[in-house]
A protein has these predicted regions:
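Residue-level signal for short hydrophobic patches within transmembrane helices
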Residues: 14-33, 37, 60-67, 104, ...
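Hydrophobic/aromatic residues in alpha-helical transmembrane segments
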Residues: 38, 75, 116-117, 150-154, ...
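Interfacial/gating helices of multi-pass transporter permease domains
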Residues: 42-62, 129-136, 192-193
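Hydrophobic transmembrane alpha-helices of multi-pass small-molecule transporters
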Residues: 63, 177-182, 207-211
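Alpha-helical transmembrane segments of multi-pass membrane transporters/permeases
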Residues: 89, 102, 157-182, 193, ...
Length: 214
């Protein structure tokens, strides 16, 4: 992160607002497409029961995103303050700490989900007739959930001085997810595991791009 990538001190408020707003909005749109894409491909390629299993397992997705929002928003505020004071090294440490701690925390949650998928599915209220589908998706998704959290955290830090970079990283991640969803579900017939793996790979690519930028 660099302090002068966007001149907050001299740029007009309207221009600054637009410079931050539109890339951020587009990035959020592409982020939402992650979920929408999975729903469309799962529903059309696997069936309604599989789509129901994915939707019932959604609280895990929300938890991972919430973890990312908590660490990302808080950490980015602290980093922004340090950048304003000219402490770029401290701001980079803030980004590293927020990303690593959230990644580790979500990894621990994922391990629990993968160790007890049936119990988690029952807690989430999954009907017995689709519990195997829910187990399949929970195990596959949990293996990559920490990258969703990390991607969310990194997006906040990248937006501090590179809102367009954050937007393009999310765009690339979403496109990869769409392409892999089609390949894994319709071509290779990997089912719900394929849908989760496609999403995970897209998120990993997004994380790599943002880490390279930061």
């Amino acid at each position: 992160m660099q302090r002068d990538s966007i001149d907050f001190g001299s740029m007009k408020i309207g221009q600054l607002f637009c410079k931050q707003l539109f890339p951020t909005l587009l990035g959020m749109v592409f982020s939402a497409l992650f979920v929408i894409t999975d729903g469309v491909f799962v529903g059309r390629g696997i069936g309604s029961d599989a789509l129901a299993a994915v939707n019932i397992a959604a609280p895990l997705f929300v938890f991972a995103a919430g973890m990312g929002l908590m660490f990302g928003m808080g950490g980015a505020i602290v980093a922004s303050i340090n950048l304003a004071r000219g402490k770029e090294r401290v701001a980079n440490i803030n980004a590293t700490q927020a990303t690593l701690v959230s990644f580790i925390d979500m990894t621990l949650v994922s391990i629990l989900v993968m160790a007890f998928p049936t119990s988690v599915a029952r807690i989430l209220g999954v009907p017995e007739d689709i519990i195997e589908l829910a187990r399949e998706y929970l195990i596959a998704y949990a293996a990559f959930a920490m990258f969703q959290t990390a991607l969310c955290v990194l997006t906040f830090f990248t937006r501090i001085d590179g809102p367009k970079i954050a937007m393009w990283c999310m765009t690339i991640s979403t496109v990869i997810n769409i392409v892999l969803d089609y390949l894994f579900i319709f071509v290779y017939k990997w089912g719900l595991t394929g849908a989760a793996v496609a999403t995970g790979i897209g998120e990993i690519v997004g994380c790599i791009l943002m880490v390279a930028y930061l």
